[in-house]
């Protein structure tokens, strides 16, 4: 049984380690693999997905691989047009009726074939992933990435019932999408609520906690694989996420994990959440920060080391490798 799975169920002898966006532009090998392919073509190429996913374990020696895909892949199931130019560009109107595919195995065949290939080649667990409902709704309503989500917030305030209905539809589709990934061979699930920091605290429970609770409940009725929830938020809202039913909670770098372990009687399995900007430092300085960060967390029995957001494109590969080496040398016994 792998370290990643162990930390969610039994104890591990050291903190398992993997990273958000652990494969990406910071890797010369990834840039060579992608070559001149467009991002959309790359994300729909079974062989490319397979080889890119394998770069994480092979180059970093991490304890888990996360499927190399994009959160917008879910939109294939709605037949919504999107592209990367270079950022996400989505053609969607809130007036459109969302109808999800009745043949997900065919719609996502490029992805499911990659998962089946990977399971044969990996010696670590493969993590399936998808966006949580609020984050996917933000992409749809903004037509792509956004800093302040003005269209989303305006729609949310003007049409709260319609926004609730949109979140419900997205959650139901995400259950189908992730269930197919698990049935193809993935052994764990990572949910990404990466747009949630924009919400006022008073709206967090309605638009983040409740939809994720519904999503996780439906997932647990369909699959037995462990579920981790990544969420961008502050400490006060993070505590609210304990009611979602996620097996592991993964805050971004705004949350002080050490304080969570102190404040919560039964903190359960936590994952994260070192600031990815620290990886940009000269290696000796970075490792000093890492040792301080781990001084308390490494002793927590259900702790998984990870980044508090995706690894940045400017990151030296050697620093990520050094972080893994530091983690794998830890003994908590």
From Swiss-Prot:
Pfam families: URO-D. It is an enzyme of class 4 (lyase). Its main location: cytoplasm. The record marks 70 as: Transition state stabilizer. It comes from the Bacteria. One of its GO terms (molecular function) is uroporphyrinogen decarboxylase activity. InterPro entries: UROD/MetE-like_sf, Uroporphyrinogen_deCO2ase_HemE, Uroporphyrinogen_deCOase. Catalyzes the decarboxylation of four acetate groups of uroporphyrinogen-III to yield coproporphyrinogen-III. Belongs to the uroporphyrinogen decarboxylase family. Homodimer. This is Uroporphyrinogen decarboxylase.
């Amino acid at each position: 049984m792998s370290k990643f799975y162990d930390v969610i169920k039994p104890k591990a002898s050291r903190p398992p380690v993997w990273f958000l966006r652990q494969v990406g532009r910071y890797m010369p090998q990834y840039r060579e693999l992608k070559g001149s392919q467009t991002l959309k073509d790359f994300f729909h190429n079974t062989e490319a997905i397979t080889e890119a996913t394998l770069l994480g374990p092979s180059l970093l020696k991490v304890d888990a691989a996360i499927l190399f895909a994009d959160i917008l892949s879910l939109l294939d199931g709605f037949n919504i047009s999107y592209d990367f130019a270079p950022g996400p560009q989505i053609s969607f109107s809130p007036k459109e009726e969302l109808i999800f595919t009745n043949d997900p195995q065919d719609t996502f065949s490029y992805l499911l074939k990659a998962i089946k290939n990977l399971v044969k080649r990996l010696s670590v667990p493969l993590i399936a992933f998808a966006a949580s409902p609020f984050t996917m709704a933000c992409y749809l309503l903004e037509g792509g990435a956004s800093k302040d989500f003005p269209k989303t917030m305006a729609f949310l305030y003007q049409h709260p019932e319609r926004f609730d209905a949109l979140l419900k539809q997205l959650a139901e589709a995400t259950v189908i999408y992730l269930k197919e990934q698990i049935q193809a061979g993935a052994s764990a699930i990572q949910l990404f609520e990466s747009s949630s920091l924009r919400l006022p605290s008073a709206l967090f429970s309605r638009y983040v906690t409740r939809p994720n609770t519904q999503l996780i409940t439906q997932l647990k009725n369909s699959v037995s694989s462990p579920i981790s929830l990544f969420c961008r938020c502050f400490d006060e809202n993070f505590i609210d996420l304990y009611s979602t039913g996620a097996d592991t909670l993964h805050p971004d770098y705004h949350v002080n994990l050490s304080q969570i372990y102190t404040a919560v009687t039964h903190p359960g399995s936590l994952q994260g959440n070192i600031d990815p900007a620290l990886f940009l430092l000269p290696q000796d300085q970075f490792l000093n920060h890492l040792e301080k960060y781990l001084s308390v967390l490494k002793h927590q029995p259900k702790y998984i080391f990870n980044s508090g957001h995706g690894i940045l494109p400017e990151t030296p590969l050697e620093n990520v490798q050094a972080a893994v080496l530091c983690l794998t040398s830890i003994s908590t016994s």
